[in-house]
Amino acid sequence: MKRIFNIVLIFAVAAMTLASCDSNNRNQDYMQPKLAMQPDGIVRLSKIKVNPEYLDEYMKFAAEVGTVSLQTEPGVLTMYAVADKDDPCSITILETYADQEAYRRHIASEHFQKYKQGTIHMVDSLVLDDVTPLNPKNKIVNFIESE
């Protein structure tokens, strides 16, 4: 149980922080100004099953790609990853992209390709579920805190 807690804690601290903040905080020096969600925007739950022997290594890759994506890509609006409390190898990532083009730029980016190529052998399964927000007016403000 302590190992699970430590993994979740390390990942949460290293990867990203979901927080409410005013619009001024979204445009800090360490973050690109974010684009607005467009009608063709994407809200996705990525469900990943990681091979247990690679979990620690996978977490490092995931933390890096999440951080770099939020810091450098205006169209990446949210990258919030969580691990199942009872099965830390089951990872779910809430991803939001301003539009289809932002998603295409993201998956073509150097940091995403590094993550994808570096973790492909670590992932047992991947399900990408595009979802529809129940209340489109409810916005998530996701940012990386400066160190």
Where are these regions (language model features)?
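General detector of folded, globular domains
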Residues: 43, 63-69
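Bacterial N-terminal signal peptides that target proteins for export
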Residues: 1-8
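Short, surface-exposed ligand-recognition loops at beta-strand->loop->(often short) alpha-helix junctions
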Residues: 49-58
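Glycine-rich beta-strand-turn "strand-cap" elements at beta-sheet edges
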Residues: 17, 22-43, 80-87, 116-147
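Bacterial N-terminal signal peptides
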Residues: 8-17
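An amphipathic, aromatic/His-enriched active-site/gating alpha helix that lines ligand/cofactor pockets
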Residues: 25-27, 68-78, 96-132
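Short, well-ordered beta-strand segments in beta-rich or mixed alpha/beta enzyme
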Residues: 41-49, 78-107
